[in-house]
């Protein structure tokens, strides 16, 4: 998809295959930028078809084709687990999908490596940020606040639920299951990736798409092993598996068939400092692409 306007904006990068999101708001550029300033941390970059840009850690639109989503998303029910700033949820909805997203209440729910190293992360329940029409109290961390800013700006209808990856179950969504379950760059940040995949499987009617780090193919015999990323330095990274290990994760979670032979590029755009570690978060990387089926 190409931008509708030929006007060039200084922060807009040129990319032949870039995916531009639709700007469905009445806000002018100044109003848009002022609303975006309400959020201090953007995990995803937003490049719109009218030239408006909000830059974040990662520019998904530049490498979107690598995820190999179904070509037709209209009418599908999609669950985006760990939506972050909500780029994928926005794209899914603009393609006609029925979108549900989840994210944690705050950093108190993150799987932190050495939690006592981060005294600023409270273990207490945070104050709710808002209430929904059905009375549910909603909480969000700086990572997911961007979703709410864009939801308000664009008028998105995506349903939001507070939940850790391990808490996903049909009962959370009124016994609903989803045609497609998406877990983008999440598994490496979890202590128990198998448990999270089991939870995802419980609400998956057809297909799971996920990405994660993987040990090189030349790892010893490509045995089903995983390495702890104790030296990652970001406080939220845990495991790097071999390809054989990813296969065992998926089988253990209940998926019957899968393809884990492809990769996706995650490109840094405008790195922010992580709100927990205060280190720059954006590092371009190649991740293993997982397509799994129930």
Predicted regions and their residues:
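N-terminal, positively charged/glycine-rich alpha-helical extensions of SAM-dependent methyltransferases
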Residues: 2-48
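Conserved alpha-helix/loop element of class I SAM-dependent methyltransferases that forms part
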Residues: 53-75
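Short, conserved loop/helix-junction motifs that constitute active-site signature segments
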Residues: 73, 92, 200-203
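Conserved class I S-adenosyl-L-methionine
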Residues: 76-84, 100
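Residues at the starts of beta-strands that form the adenosine-phosphate
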Residues: 77, 97-98, 206-207
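Receiver (REC) domain switch-region micro-motif
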Residues: 78, 181, 186
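Class I SAM-dependent methyltransferase SAM/SAH-binding core
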Residues: 87-168
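S-adenosyl-L-methionine-dependent methyltransferase catalytic module, highlighting the catalytic core
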Residues: 136-144, 166-173, 178, 182, ...
């Amino acid at each position: 998809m190409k931008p509708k306007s030929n006007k060039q904006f200084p922060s807009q990068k040129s990319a032949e295959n870039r995916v531009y999101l639709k700007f469905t708001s009445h806000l002018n550029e100044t109003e848009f930028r002022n609303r975006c300033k309400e959020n201090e941390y953007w995990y995803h970059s937003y490049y719109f078809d009218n030239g408006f840009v909000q830059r974040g850690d990662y520019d998904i639109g530049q490498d979107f084709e690598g995820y190999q989503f179904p070509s037709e998303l209209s009418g599908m029910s999609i669950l985006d687990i760990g939506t972050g700033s909500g780029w994928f949820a926005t794209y899914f909805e603009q393609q006609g999908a029925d979108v549900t997203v989840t994210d944690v209440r705050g950093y108190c729910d993150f799987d932190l490596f050495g939690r006592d190293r981060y005294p600023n992360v409270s273990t207490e329940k945070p104050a709710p940020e808002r209430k929904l029409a059905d009375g549910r109290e909603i909480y969000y961390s700086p990572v997911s606040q961007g979703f709410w800013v864009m939801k308000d700006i664009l008028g998105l209808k995506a349903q939001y639920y507070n939940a850790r990856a391990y808490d996903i179950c049909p009962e959370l969504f009124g016994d609903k299951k989803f045609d497609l379950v998406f877990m983008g760059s999440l598994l490496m940040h979890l202590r128990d990736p198998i448990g999270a995949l089991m939870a995802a499987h419980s609400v998956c009617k057809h297909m799971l798409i996920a990405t994660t780090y993987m040990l090189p193919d030349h790892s010893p015999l490509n045995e089903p092993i995983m390495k702890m990323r104790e030296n990652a330095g970001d406080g939220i990274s845990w495991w790097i598996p071999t390809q054989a290990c990813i296969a065992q994760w998926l089988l253990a979670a209940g998926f019957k068939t899968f393809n884990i032979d492809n990769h996706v590029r995650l490109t840094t755009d405008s790195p922010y400092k992580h709100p927990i570690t205060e280190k720059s978060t954006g590092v371009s990387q190649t991740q293993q692409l997982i397509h799994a089926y129930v």
